[in-house]
Every structure is written in structure tokens, then in C-alpha cells.
């Protein structure tokens, strides 16, 4: 079946899905959770086929591709968490009366058909499907060739579970064609698809934006900063940086760049770098920070634009909060940015002027996540400004429409 035909099939199934009650949708999700749990060994064995042929087994992408029993069961827990979330469809977000006799309600409604194009992340196959179903949207899944066996296996388990439960399995479509041509064909199905979400690095985001005839909700990489201000609690700053870098360095919300107020650098750089070395982190430093610790490596200018996704970070001194804000807005990707400070006015200036989906005060950047924000599973982190920004959960997969009632009102 062609990609275009699959998109048309998804459009027809979306109309059926919009008639499902919350209870119906939760039954579908429950069937998916039970299916994944029952067939976890099959999923892991198919994942191993992808792992065996993956070229760089030390890369961040390899870690994202890897599935084991713990990670598969985390996917199951994620599905069950979405079951417990409030269904946004039909929620009245505003309601008012007009002198003309109109009673107007603004109501949340599904988008229709959502296509997700993603890289070597088999967990997205589950997250995207269940979030779309719960929010009343049909899903079209197009993963990468690096995860093709894993994605096929997960989709097969989900599809069979949904059909066995007595529901329309076509509410989730899987594009088996992992080529660029297949992706381009999907991106031209504007008559069938309402929204496309790229989930991956800047290259994928650029490809989708350049080729799509469908509105795009960009979920891109992170180039996250932590600014340590002159009023910062230095021990608190070290702990926050360690968690933001080392908790899971392959994620887009891991910190990559440390900006340090020059007035505290002599005190802070040595204690930070002792901790970083203990954690196995490679530090790329500007000339001033390198002069304080010659065990660091001198950073090149291009390093400050890098998303390392590994145990590497940069250190750079700045002359104050305004300088830090300028650096972040110039080099950041509008993802997650943090200030460590004990000065409330300085914190307010930072959170007001830094252009990012999430700004943090004395908090690890690792919290930019659907589960941590209480959204359940997420479709990605939107770094754009239109429609939705930050973690893409259920509400972000709906739009608002108007229901207007009257007792025969006529416009004069």
C-alpha cells in the first residue's frame, strides 16, 4: 500500500475515532499495554536485530535505540499513565453569552490525523500512538531505518492487540518505507494529514520544514545552558550541573554549556571540575576557565553551539546576567535554560528575557519532560512558538473550536 493510501485510510479511521468515548479509548490503550507486556521478549529480540547492525555502539543514538526488559516495561507503565490522564476532548475552556442571544462555548477537539517522523527511538512508536489515541487523533508513524525491526515489532503487537479488543486497528498506521522518498510522500499528504511532528535532531527538523505541505510542530534538539550567577549557592550549582549533565547525557534536556559569572569563577571552576572529573565528564573551557584548571581542554568557538549528547560540556565566563542572556539567546535552541541564583530580581530577569520553552531557577534542566510536568507520555519537546511550546502532551494534540447555540437568533 502506498504512503498516500495509508494517509487516506488514517483520515477515515480518525472520523471513527472521534466517536469513541473516553472509556473506549482507555480500553484501546489497556489492550496495547497488555499486548506489549505479553510480547516483550519478541520486541526485545527484534530490537537486537537493529542493535547488531548499528555502526556506533558507543553513541547516544545507540543508547536511544536499545530496548531491554526494564525499558519495555517503562513503555507499558507510560501507556497506563496515559489511561489515568484526563481526556481533554470535549473540555469547555471558555463559555459566554452575547447580547444577540448567542451562547458560545470554546471546546477542545482532536486535530484529526497526526504524522510523527522520528529517529532511532522505538519508544516513540508507543508514546506517539497512545497520545494520539487518547486525544482522539489517528496516528501515522514513520520511524528511521536504524530502528525498523523494533518499530515493526511494536506496531505489530499494538495493531493486533487493538483489533483483538474489537476496535479499528487502522487508527494507527505504520509507514514501513523508511526512505527519504517515503517521508517526502507523507509530507505531501496535506489533504489527509493535519499535523506533522518531527522528533529528532536538527537535520530531521530541517528536512521536514523544507519538504512539508502540512503544518509542522517542531520537536528539535536541545543546546541547554546553566548560568551560575554571582549570588549562587556554589554547592547547589555543582549538584544541579551534575544532575543536568550526568543523569542521562543522551537526552535533549541534558545541559551542554555552563556560563559562569566571572566574579566567582576562581572559586567555582575548581570545585565544579573536581566533580565533573569524578563523573567522567570532559570539560571544554574558554581561556579564562582553562587558566584556572589546566586539566581542561581549550574550547573552539564551534563547541559552544554543539549538542554533545555525551559526557562533555563547555565552560565559559560571562560578565553578568545580561551577558548570559545574550549568549543563550544567540546560541541556544529555545529548549531548556537555567539560572542558579539567590537573587530573585536576577531570576525574574532571566526567566523573562531568555527565549526558551522552559526556563529554570535553581532546578535541573532534566525536568523538561512530559512525565515530570504531569502530562504523562510526551510526543517530544516543541521549541517553536506556534500552537504549542514545551512538552507535547494530550492538550497540545487538540485544537479549540466553537459551539454556538441560541433560540433562533438572526443577525441584524
Model-found features: residue ranges?
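N-terminal Rossmann-like NAD(P)+-binding subdomain of aldehyde/semialdehyde dehydrogenases
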Residues: 1-106, 131
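A structural signal for short, well-ordered beta-strand elements
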Residues: 16-19, 230, 317, 340
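Flexible, glycine/charged-enriched surface loops at secondary-structure junctions
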Residues: 22-26, 166-172, 248-254, 280-288, ...
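Rossmann-like NAD(P) dinucleotide-binding subdomain of oxidoreductase/dehydrogenase enzymes
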Residues: 93-235
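Structural motif
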Residues: 112-116, 130-131, 137-140, 170-173, ...
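ALDH superfamily catalytic-core signature
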Residues: 120-123, 127-135, 157, 161-164, ...
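Conserved C-terminal structural/oligomerization subdomain of aldehyde/semialdehyde dehydrogenase
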Residues: 300-412
Amino acid at each position: 500500500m502506498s504512503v498516500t493510501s495509508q494517509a487516506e485510510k488514517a483520515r477515515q479511521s480518525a472520523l471513527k475515532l472521534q466517536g469513541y468515548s473516553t472509556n473506549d479509548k482507555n480500553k484501546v490503550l489497556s489492550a496495547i499495554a497488555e499486548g506489549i507486556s505479553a510480547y516483550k521478549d519478541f520486541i526485545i529480540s527484534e530490537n537486537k536485530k537493529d542493535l547488531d547492525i548499528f555502526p556506533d555502539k558507543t553513541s547516544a543514538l545507540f543508547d536511544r535505540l536499545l530496548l531491554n526488559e526494564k525499558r519495555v516495561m517503562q513503555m507499558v507503565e507510560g501507556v497506563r499513565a496515559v489511561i489515568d490522564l484526563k481526556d481533554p476532548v470535549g473540555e469547555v475552556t471558555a463559555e459566554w453569552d452575547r447580547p444577540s442571544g448567542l451562547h458560545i462555548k470554546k471546546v477542545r477537539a482532536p486535530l484529526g490525523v497526526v504524522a510523527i517522523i522520528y529517529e532511532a527511538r522505538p519508544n516513540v512508536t508507543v508514546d506517539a500512538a497512545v497520545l494520539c489515541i487518547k486525544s482522539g487523533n489517528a496516528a501515522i508513524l514513520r520511524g528511521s531505518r536504524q530502528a525498523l525491526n523494533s518499530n515493526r515489532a511494536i506496531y505489530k503487537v499494538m495493531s493486533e492487540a487493538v483489533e483483538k479488543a474489537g476496535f479499528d486497528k487502522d487508527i494507527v498506521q505504520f509507514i514501513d518505507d523508511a526512505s527519504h522518498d517515503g517521508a517526502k510522500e507523507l509530507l505531501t499528504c496535506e489533504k489527509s494529514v493535519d499535523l506533522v511532528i518531527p522528533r529528532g535532531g536538527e537535520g530531521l527538523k530541517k528536512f521536514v520544514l523544507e519538504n512539508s505541505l502540512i503544518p509542522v510542530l517542531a520537536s528539535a534538539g536541545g543546546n541547554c545552558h546553566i548560568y551560575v550567577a554571582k549570588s549562587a549557592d556554589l554547592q547547589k550549582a555543582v549538584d544541579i550541573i551534575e544532575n543536568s549533565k550526568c543523569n542521562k547525557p543522551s537526552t535533549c534536556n541534558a545541559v551542554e554549556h555552563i556560563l559562569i559569572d566571572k566574579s566567582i569563577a576562581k572559586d567555582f571552576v575548581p570545585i565544579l571540575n573536581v566533580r565533573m572529573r569524578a563523573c567522567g565528564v570532559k570539560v571544554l573551557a574558554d581561556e579564562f576557565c582553562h587558566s584556572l584548571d589546566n586539566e581542561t581542554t581549550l574550547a573552539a568557538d564551534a563547541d559552544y553551539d554543539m549538542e554533545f549528547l555525551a559526557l562533555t560540556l563547555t565552560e565559559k565566563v560571562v560578565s553578568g546576567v545580561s551577558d548570559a542572556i545574550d549568549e543563550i539567546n544567540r546560541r541556544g535552541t529555545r529548549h531548556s535554560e537555567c539560572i542558579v541564583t539567590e537573587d530573585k530580581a536576577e531570576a525574574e530577569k532571566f526567566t523573562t528575557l531568555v527565549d526558551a520553552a522552559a526556563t529554570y531557577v535553581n532546578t535541573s534542566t532534566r525536568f523538561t519532560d512530559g512525565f515530570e510536568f504531569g502530562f504523562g507520555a510526551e510526543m517530544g519537546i516543541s521549541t517553536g512558538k506556534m500552537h504549542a511550546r514545551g512538552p507535547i502532551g494530550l492538550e497540545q494534540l487538540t485544537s479549540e473550536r466553537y459551539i454556538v447555540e441560541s433560540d433562533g437568533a438572526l443577525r441584524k
